[in-house]
UniProtKB/Swiss-Prot annotation:
GO molecular-function term, one example from the UniProt record: NADH dehydrogenase (ubiquinone) activity
Transmembrane segments: 1-21, 57-77, 86-106
Superkingdom in the source lineage: Eukaryota
EC number(s) recorded for this UniProt protein: 7.1.1.2
Keyword terms of this UniProt record: Electron transport, Membrane, Mitochondrion, NAD, Respiratory chain, Translocase, Transmembrane, Transmembrane helix, Transport, Ubiquinone
Source taxonomy: Eukaryota, Metazoa, Ecdysozoa, Arthropoda, Hexapoda
Main location: mitochondrion
UniProt keyword annotation of Metal-binding present: no
Name of the protein described by the UniProt record: NADH-ubiquinone oxidoreductase chain 3
Length: 117
């Protein structure tokens, strides 16, 4: 128990030292602040470097992430077909694909997949 306590203390001290070193080494000087401003061939910037982001791109990205995660969960199901009951595997696969199709239908119905709005 004493050994575990000593190891935990040493790990804690090493963590604190590394965090303090990272803080000291990552300090920005006044000269580095010029790097944060946009640079356009030596001229002052005409427009802001931050452009507004269309909400349509954000919605498409969120829909892509949701369906991408669902597909990533669906792919390993092919590997477990050998070890599981065929009826259970079939019902689970159909249920999962059915949920995917319901989500796709809902997004299509809401008009989230139409770009010309």
């Amino acid at each position: 128990m004493l050994m575990l306590s000593i190891m935990a203390t040493i790990i804690f001290i090493i963590t604190i030292v590394v965090m303090m070193l990272a803080t000291l080494l990552s300090k920005k000087t006044l000269l580095d602040r010029e790097k944060c401003s946009p640079f356009e061939c030596g001229f002052d910037p005409m427009n802001s470097s931050r452009l507004p982001f269309a909400l349509r791109f954000f919605l498409i990205a969120i829909i892509f992430l949701i369906f991408d995660v669902e597909i990533a969960l669906l792919l390993p199901m092919v590997m477990i077909i050998k070890t599981s009951n065929l009826m259970n595997w079939t019902m689970t696969s159909f249920f999962f694909i059915f949920i995917l199709l319901i989500g796709l239908y809902h997004e299509w119905n809401q008009g989230a997949l139409e770009w010309n709005n």
